[in-house]
Amino acid sequence: MKNDQIINGLNEYIGDRYQPCEYPALRQQATEWSESKPLAGIRILDNTPLFTNTLLKYIPLLSGGAELTLAISERTPYDSSLIPVMRSLGIRVIENCNQGDFDCILDCGGSHAHLKPRYGYAELTRSGYYHYKDTELPVILVDDSRIKAIETCLGTGDGFLRAMKQLGHKDFTNRKIIVFGFGKVGCGIVYYAMKEGAEVRIVDEPGTLIPPGTELISRYDSDAIAAAVRQAWCVVTATGIRDAMLQNGAAEEILAGKQLVAAMGIENEWGSSLPEERILNHNIPLNFILEEPTRLRYIDPTMALSNVAALALLSGKIPPGVNRIAPETEKFYMDIVEMKD
């Protein structure tokens, strides 16, 4: 009964912000789990970044019978105005959780790798992998999936572009942008910047395959990096690696110049080499200045995968260490999204 009341409160708060077609995976998950109750009595700690569209992730968990606790970590961006709203609805919220008795932890960025849940963890991000790679408990890396690749590339790239425009930087035409890291996040940023007419240079490993019309700079060539940064309109970091920007020549050029600097990785890539005020959004991923950092249509199946990972952990069939989500599970949710389209 309590979960039903919380769900009603969440639905009332969300109102008509989103159309059902924007979250087919979570909607079907909630419908199915409200009947089967696969999480009845299961204590779940969820550290998905708290924003309005994240509230739709909680509905399937609550529908499934979970005892849900939300984690707020200083390492993970969130909308602080939602904390009192969640508490008023009866959802437990813990800030900087250092202890607790949980069955499953649905984590982001490895913020709760220090806790020991009964069944294991699901981790949303690639950066979180480095916090879990040596764990003796089962971990499902949601990031290691086609669904997450689509969200991270298209959703985060779109978020970068929307955030830049919200800050007034609307004209990319013939502007020089240098992107550090050409993984899933960097790929999306490059895609959207090129669509807007920017001249893009990419810093990554020698031999990295890059799109036509861009230029690759070796991450080991500090002279070339310094020269490119000196000429850049905007410098974007998307390596996902802590301190990745130390001693590569970029910081010195930025301190002497007027380049825009955007961080798009959850880890602190600049370390102590740049003051926070020199980086847009104070070195927090730039898309998190937006009310909707990643559009719901991109993040819906990813959040559904994070939820269903709890069921896989409860099965007891996931071995210790880092694991992929089962291919048939990912296909199930991908098919739901593709049918919507």
Q: What is each PLM-predicted segment?
A:
Residues 50-66:
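Histidine-anchored nucleotide/phosphate-binding helix
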Residues 91-101, 205-231:
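Short acidic low-complexity segments
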Residues 40-54, 168-194, 204:
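Glycine-rich adenosine-cofactor-binding loop
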Residues 11-27, 141-172, 260-341:
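Adenosine-phosphate binding glycine-rich loop
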Residues 106-107, 117-130, 234-280, 300:
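ADP-ribose/adenylate-binding Rossmann-like module
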Residues 68-82, 180, 195-213:
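NAD(P)-binding Rossmann-fold cofactor-contacting core
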Residues 64-67, 91, 117-119, 135-137, ...:
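A short helix->loop->beta-strand "cap" motif at the edges of active sites that frequently abuts
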Residues 1-39, 72-173:
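Glycine/serine-rich phosphate-binding loop and adjoining beta1-alpha1 elements at the start
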